[in-house]
Amino acid sequence: MLREMLKSKIHRLTVTDADLHYEGSLSLDEYLMELADLKPFEKIDVYNINNGARFQTYVIPAPRYSGEVKLNGAAARLGHKGDLIIIASYAQYTEEELENYAPKLIFVNEKNQPVEVKESTEVK
């Protein structure tokens, strides 16, 4: 049996822009994508802390170390510049893989720079 579990999470990102007329997706600093083990066009869940909106889209790389977090296309209706969001990705794991399972957790500052990166199943 496969279980779908959190693969990675980037916590409290600040939206830097929103472009309603772009084709779609979420543009994310390439460095943050690497830290969270996200590949271009990978499906992500986005949770808007400011307004409670939750939606799925896919991620595309923005310039490395830019801090860019841009909502594109229809997603631009679900958040605004300055909103705080969480990005989560999920994967399926076998029971054997779960024996050593730990999701990647990335915490950022107000400039979307990573301040803590850990792999943990600890629940606070």
Swiss-Prot record:
The keyword Protein biosynthesis does not apply. InterPro entries: Asp_de-COase-like_dom_sf, Asp_decarbox. Substrate binds at residues 57, 73-75. It comes from the Bacteria. Pathway: Cofactor biosynthesis; (R)-pantothenate biosynthesis; beta-alanine from L-aspartate: step 1/1. GO terms for cellular component: cytosol. It catalyses: L-aspartate + H(+) = beta-alanine + CO2. The active site is at residues 25, 58. GO terms for biological process: alanine biosynthetic process; pantothenate biosynthetic process. Heterooctamer of four alpha and four beta subunits. This is Aspartate 1-decarboxylase. It comes from Aquifex aeolicus (strain VF5). The gene is panD.
